[in-house]
Amino acid sequence: MLVYVLFVVGFVFLIKGADLMVEGASSIGKRLNVSSLIIGLTIVSFGTSLPELLVNIIASYNDSPDIGVGNVLGSNVANILLILGISAIISPLPITKNTYFIEVPFSLTATLLVGFLANASIFGRSTEFVISRNDGLVLLFFFFLFLGYVYIVSKQRKSEFSADEYKVMSMPRSIVYIVLGIAGLYFGGLWVVDGAVTMARFFNMSEHFIGLTIIAIGTSLPELVTSAVAAFKRDTDIAVGNVVGSNIFNLLWILGLSATLKPIPYDVISNSDIFMIIASSTALILAVVVGKRPVISRWEGFFFLVAYIWYIAFLIERG
């Protein structure tokens, strides 16, 4: 029973730990006169992906790589179909030109790249299905290309990064926040992974299934709440771009760094999940083509949500 309580508490620790670490590091950055633009692109962007990253690294070193891979792929499907679906039902979501013509195609390319590298044995590159250290470095290379693009776009929209956006605290308090954040991330990640393994064994489910569903939804909850609240406030200008950017971070940064630290065994059953990400990303493009305007309408959001429910049913059937 305790392990399931810690499993739930682990998600809280992960999310709050990332928040504390970002607040502390951002405060120190402001004290050192680092620009709000750089803080937003580095500390905040990387900090918000820390829960998924810690889960992946801990799962990998605990010999449960299926949890990590499932978490990344499941989060990407949930980001598009669940988060954008619910948000669009609340309020139609505009898609910016950069998101439509650059970021969504880049996300599709990243998904195809992960699929190609993971299935390298089919092409005679190796004898086993694994995302190797070299593959991880390739993913990181493309990630830093994407980061360069984000930097260029952000400089053009520099006015969006307010100097007052990040709270400045005393240095001791900032350090305490960072230490507490690191502790929360570590113990939260540990409890989530341990709980997932125990749950999989008890209910006779695969670790991959747990990663694709419960952990993926759990680590996506902050984005879901933020996007839903923004939709209620009609503040949805960059909602789609944020989700697509998060998917690129997951595929290139989290999988890339995790594989560089320790090669990740890959189960070919994940190919159907990669296909689902490709289909979801393609649906984003079709939403504009079918609707004849750059927006995800309410009925398209409903379609996304139904597709996600169907995907969960498919995963339950697959086991």
Question: Which residues are covered by each model-predicted region?
Answer:
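Hydrophobic alpha-helical segments, chiefly the membrane-spanning helices
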Residues: 1-319
